[in-house]
From Swiss-Prot:
One of its GO terms (molecular function) is ATP binding. The active site is at H192. Belongs to the protein kinase superfamily. Ser/Thr protein kinase family. PROSITE patterns: PROTEIN_KINASE_ATP (PS00107), PROTEIN_KINASE_DOM (PS50011), PROTEIN_KINASE_ST (PS00108). It catalyses: L-seryl-[protein] + ATP = O-phospho-L-seryl-[protein] + ADP + H(+); L-threonyl-[protein] + ATP = O-phospho-L-threonyl-[protein] + ADP + H(+). It comes from the Eukaryota. It comes from Schizosaccharomyces pombe (strain 972 / ATCC 24843) (Fission yeast). It holds the Pfam family Pkinase. GO terms for biological process: regulation of vacuole fusion, non-autophagic; signaling; vacuolar protein processing. This is Serine/threonine-protein kinase ppk13. Residues 76-344 form the Protein kinase domain. Transmembrane segments: none annotated. ATP binds at L38, G39, E40, G41, G42, F43, A44, F45, V46, K61.
């Protein structure tokens, strides 16, 4: 048993080295004391840290740079997005740094504001335990915030983006295609790629939210010109996009197909449904014995027979969960409908 624990620690040591409670890390000449682990996923850990000098609290994301320079570039690109995107609804970072540790492993540290209220996912879990619903007014405000974040990404002015797009700048896919609309009104379109309640952080008043986790962001449209590219896109989507929120066009990518920002709109619909009913629309089908992938690809879901929500919210979900991407509304169209309802 002792050897088993030793082997486990040896395996995890590259991820947790120097980041135990009360340990201190130095980022760009500022010292921060680790308070506790807030969350983890993939190659990243998020810690609550306290500035040693002024005692302010922050969130620190530690990203493991696997696969050499490729991993470093991916993590640094994520940090760059957090630093340069100019929207109140996208999480901004304070600073970041590439760090090489004693064992030779490399990490990117990103320092963020600390959101003590946690994520929308935590609110959903609490409501599920209590058997209660989130108010429609609160949901509409959250959706408005998310639509503003998505509109910024999907209709991004090239001057606001971290840099002009290049062939190898995409994060989600290894062999990306240059977006075809970059010369059209100087717009650059990004897809977030992993919209879900866990990635929506609550402000102190719990009213507004910000979108986080930019590790899946990439430029769109992405065209799969052959089977090899189609498989690569599909594989990367399976790595980056959480399955219950993943758009059907990412499950079975075919040569000649194009991935657009409408994949985010599908995820928006899944997220809204989850906020309303505490489970994603397709997980409910699986709980009744179905296949998740099949349910998603067939857009097979249903609403509970009894619930407190208006027809409008259900119609928004239905509009977003169209199998054909071009039939889904844009973030701008969703925002217009949602804000109209809020202001009534």
């Amino acid at each position: 048993m002792q050897n088993l624990w030793k082997n486990a620690l040896d395996t995890l040591s590259p991820y947790i080295s120097n980041l135990f409670d009360n340990d201190v890390v130095c980022i760009n000449n500022e010292r921060y004391r680790i308070q506790k682990l807030l969350g983890e996923g993939g190659f990243a850990f998020v810690y609550l840290v306290q500035n040693v000098s002024n005692e302010k609290l922050y969130a620190l994301k530690k990203i493991k740079c696997s696969f050499g320079n490729k991993g470093i570039k991916k993590a640094m690109k994520e940090a760059d997005y957090h630093r340069k995107f100019k929207s109140n609804y996208l999480l901004k970072s304070y600073t970041h740094q590439l760090v090489k540790e004693a064992d030779g492993s490399e990490f990117v540290y990103i320092l963020f504001p600390y959101f003590a209220k946690g994520s929308v996912a935590q609110v959903i879990r609490n409501c599920d335990i209590e058997g209660s619903y989130i108010s429609e007014k609160r949901i509409l405000v959250w959706c408005s915030c998310l639509c503003k974040a998505l509109q910024y990404l999907h209709e991004n002015v090239a001057g606001d983006s971290p840099k002009q797009p290049e062939v190898n700048d995409l994060i989600m896919f290894d062999e990306p295609q240059v977006p075809q609309n970059t010369s059209n009104n100087n717009l650059v379109s990004y897809i977030h790629g992993d919209i879900k309640p866990d990635n929506l952080l609550l402000h102190e008043n719990s009213r507004e939210i910000v979108l986080t986790d930019f590790g899946s962001i990439c430029l769109v449209p992405i065209f799969a010109s052959n089977n090899s590219e189609a498989i690569a896109i599909q594989d990367k989507a399976s790595e980056n996009c959480t399955m219950p929120f993943r758009a059907p066009e990412l499950f079975h990518v075919k040569a000649g197909s194009t991935i657009t920002e409408k994949a985010d709109i599908w995820s928006f619909g899944c997220t809204l449904y989850t906020i309303m009913f505490h489970a994603s629309p397709f997980e409910r089908e699986v709980s009744q014995g179905g296949s998740l992938a099949l349910a998603v690809c067939n857009a097979q879901y249903s609403f509970p027979r009894k619930h407190p929500y208006s027809t409008l919210l259900c119609e928004i979900v239905e509009a977003c969960l169209q199998r054909e991407p071009n039939k889904r509304p844009s973030a701008r169209e969703l925002l217009s409908k949602i804000d109209l309802q809020i202001n009534q």
